[in-house]
């Protein structure tokens, strides 16, 4: 009988600890100002001269990526052209980045690619945020921009039933 009481006390102790942690997590979540975003949207990249471009929100991806081509390094400067001539937002303008990095990105099939990373900004919900973008060829993809968890964390909650939430607010 005493072992049953001990087990009950232990169970209640563990249960109280779990509930305290859940209450803490819930109160932390309530204090965060997160915006609901859908699975796809349209965004502006002011520093890159790109407006109203289709983006896909991908919580499975850690990094964010943008379609670009003609990527090359010349005398410690990264040069590239965003999008491609088939894309309606293509302007053919060559962009120069004196500050950039290289990172390893693991694809969904486990393959590792090394990509250039540049810092830029993105406008969503009429607010401008800093964003790290890896440069990749996404010409075979429906969305030229993929937004990953690194950018979404602590700013957005993704509702997969919604689309174009930010763009709809921009149109108002």
Q: Where are the language model's segments positioned?
A:
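General secretory precursor processing signal
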Residues: 4-6
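Pepsin/retropepsin-fold aspartyl endopeptidases
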Residues: 29-172
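Polybasic, lysine-rich low-complexity intrinsically disordered segments
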Residues: 16, 21-24
């Amino acid at each position: 009988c005493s072992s049953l009481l001990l087990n009950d006390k232990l169970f209640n102790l563990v249960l109280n600890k779990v509930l305290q942690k859940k209450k803490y997590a819930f109160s932390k979540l309530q204090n965060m100002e997160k915006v609901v975003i859908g699975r796809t949207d349209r965004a502006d990249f002011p520093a890159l001269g790109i407006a109203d471009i289709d983006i896909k929100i991908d919580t499975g991806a850690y990094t964010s990526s943008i379609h670009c081509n003609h990527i090359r390094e010349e005398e410690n400067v990264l040069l590239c052209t965003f999008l491609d001539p088939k894309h309606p937002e293509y302007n053919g303008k060559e962009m120069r980045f004196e500050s950039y990095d290289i990172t390893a990105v693991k694809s969904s099939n486990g393959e590792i690619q090394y990509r250039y990373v540049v810092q830029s900004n993105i406008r969503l919900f009429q607010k401008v945020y800093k964003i790290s973008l890896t440069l990749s060829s996404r010409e075979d993809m429906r969305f030229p921009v993929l937004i990953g968890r690194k950018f979404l964390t602590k700013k957005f909650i993704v509702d997969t039933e919604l689309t174009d939430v930010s763009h709809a607010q921009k149109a108002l």
